[in-house]
Curated annotation (Swiss-Prot):
Organism whose genome encodes this protein: Methanocaldococcus jannaschii (strain ATCC 43067 / DSM 2661 / JAL-1 / JCM 10045 / NBRC 100440) (Methanococcus jannaschii)
InterPro entries according to UniProt: 4Fe4S_Fe-S-bd, 4Fe4S_Fe_S_CS, Polyferredoxin-like_ET
Keyword 4Fe-4S: yes
PROSITE patterns given in the database record: 4FE4S_FER_1 (PS00198), 4FE4S_FER_2 (PS51379)
Binding-site list for [4Fe-4S] cluster: 39, 42, 45, 49, 70, 73, 76, 80, 116, 119, 122, 126, 145, 148, 151, 155
Keyword flag Membrane: no
A Pfam family reported for this protein in Swiss-Prot or TrEMBL: Fer4_7
Protein name: Uncharacterized polyferredoxin-like protein MJ0514.1
GO molecular function, one term: 4 iron, 4 sulfur cluster binding
Length: 163
């Protein structure tokens, strides 16, 4: 119903349109670094780390942090007497409003007629009556099809594939 109203008011009646909903994505990234010029290798951070992510470097002069193990709790940063440990938290938020896009439905449906056994189970189960008999095979009416995937789901021979 909404698609029909939009199509009418925006002169899109002859187009296949799809509504993309509003969405929000929040990305969080954390980074932890050791300022080697400030590190005095006191070992306090090694002692307090709850996941043993901090060790001495191979030469023993500085500390290294295994970023795969680190849980970014911040305990090491708090005990560091020289503020050599820096935790960076980056936050990126993407907000997209609802949009209307034109869809070429032929790009999303593959009908492999060689696989089709003409059982018509897809035709009988299509909620939009978008499938019709066509000789000994079927034909999908793109104008009626809503890309719901029911035909793909129910076809026993995988003759209809939605991408």
């Amino acid at each position: 119903m909404i698609k029909e109203i939009i199509a009418k008011h925006f002169n899109l009646a002859d187009k296949n349109i799809q509504l993309l909903p509003k969405f929000n994505i929040i990305l969080n990234k954390r980074e932890i670094i050791v300022k080697e010029d400030k590190c005095i290798s006191c070992g306090k951070c090694i002692e307090i780390c709850p996941v043993n992510a901090i060790t001495y470097s191979s030469d023993g002069l500085y500390i290294t942090i295994n970023k795969e193990k680190c849980v970014f709790c911040g305990k090491c940063k708090k005990v560091c007497p020289t503020n050599a440990i820096v935790i960076i938290r980056l936050r990126c938020e993407i907000n997209e409003d609802a949009r209307i896009i034109e869809v070429d439905k032929y790009e999303f449906i593959d009908y492999i007629s060689e696989r089709c056994a003409s059982c018509l189970v897809c035709l009988r189960n299509c909620p939009f009556n978008a499938i019709e008999e066509y000789g000994s095979k079927i034909r999908i009416d793109i104008n009626k099809c809503e890309l719901c995937g029911k035909c793909e789901e129910i076809c026993p021979l995988n003759a209809i594939i939605l991408r």
